[in-house]
């Protein structure tokens, strides 16, 4: 079976639409339809039911989903195995949001290379949608993200709780969105909580889908936005940014996702190191919080 057909099938499943699937894999909608039709002819069954609400799997489609994932992952694993660089024993592809590469995954990377020097690592940055697709297809071994989706054959594990604080270039910043406020799109859950806390917020002049982009704009031009505390901590210490004390703090969990089929020592070892870095990071944050509280009591 052509793995391209299986990949197209999985993309339609993930997106819930032939149109969206075509956009994701950069082909026409008719090409997606033709590939699915060819696949259905080869399997001798109908895989999707299309209606106004989108595309839904049939019973046969749900059965084939597991096999399609296995097929694509097997091919990708074969590419990994035959493509191991000389001098290394194995390869590892790790993908994460750019905000999670900052501080957290970069610390993990240094520890991983020290602990497993014979593993060739490919580091990638992407948003959740692309990371999940890479995991389903087997192109990515480990994904680190904020809002993973439930997929057959994938394990999702909580790493740590991200704290999003309203940080401003002004020491007396407003406790709600005002002039110069940059809305960072941290995902649908953040949007829902943000809307509930700030019901009168009409909308931002600037929206950034990546925290790093919004942060650079604020530092360059002034303003405020909700950013991960662990990332802005050095900027808070240097007084380039200030936490708006009366503003709400949003908690956002960070997860590690990997295939249940991958039980290789280096994959499990990489995840164990991620747990260790997350634990150390959480402990450091708790210690900083305790110091601040002690300082407030003294003053």
How would you name each of these model-derived features?
Residues 177-205, 209-215, 281-288:
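Secondary-structure junction motif
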Residues 40-57:
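A short LG(V/I)-centered, amphipathic sequence patch enriched
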Residues 82-101, 115-119, 162-163:
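Interdomain hinge and pocket-entrance segments immediately C-terminal to HTH DNA-binding domains
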Residues 127-131, 146, 199-253, 284:
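Hydrophobic hinge/microswitch elements
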Residues 10-28:
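Short helix-boundary/capping micro-motifs
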Residues 153-195, 253-260:
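Hydrophobic/proline-rich hinge and linker segments of small-molecule sensing/allosteric domains
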Residues 107-108, 129-164, 168:
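Short beta-strand-centered segments that line the small-molecule binding cleft or hinge
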Residues 192, 229-238, 247-299:
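C-terminal effector-binding regulatory domain of bacterial HTH transcription factors
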């Amino acid at each position: 079976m052509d793995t391209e057909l299986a990949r197209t099938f999985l993309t339609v499943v993930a997106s819930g639409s032939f149109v969206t699937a075509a956009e994701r894999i950069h082909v026409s909608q008719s090409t997606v339809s033709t590939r699915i039709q060819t696949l259905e002819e080869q399997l001798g069954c109908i895989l999707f039911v299309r209606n106004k609400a989108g595309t839904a799997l049939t019973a046969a489609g749900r059965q084939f989903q597991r096999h399609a994932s296995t097929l694509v992952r097997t091919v990708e694993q074969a590419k990994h195995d035959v493509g191991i660089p000389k001098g290394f024993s194995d390869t590892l592809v790790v993908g994460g949001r750019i905000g999670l590469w900052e501080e957290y995954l970069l610390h993990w990377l240094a520890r991983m290379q020290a602990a497993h020097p014979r593993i060739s690592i490919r580091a990638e940055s992407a948003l959740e949608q692309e990371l999940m697709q890479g995991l389903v297809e087997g192109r990515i071994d480990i994904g680190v993200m904020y809002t993973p989706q439930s997929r057959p054959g994938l394990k999702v594990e909580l790493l740590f709780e991200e704290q999003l604080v309203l940080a401003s270039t002004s020491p007396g910043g407003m406790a709600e969105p005002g002039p110069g406020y940059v809305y960072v799109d941290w995902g649908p859950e953040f949007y829902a909580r943000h809307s509930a806390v700030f019901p009168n917020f009409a909308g931002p002049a600037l929206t950034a889908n990546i925290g790093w982009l919004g942060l650079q704009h604020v530092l360059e031009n002034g303003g405020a936005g909700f950013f991960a505390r662990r990332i802005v901590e050095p900027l808070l210490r240097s007084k380039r940014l200030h936490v708006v004390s009366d503003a709400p703090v949003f908690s956002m969990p960070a997860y590690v996702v990997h295939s249940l089929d991958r039980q290789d020592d280096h994959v499990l070892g990489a995840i164990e190191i991620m747990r260790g870095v997350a634990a150390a990071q959480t402990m450091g944050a708790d210690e900083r919080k305790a110091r601040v509280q002690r300082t407030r009591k003294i003053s």
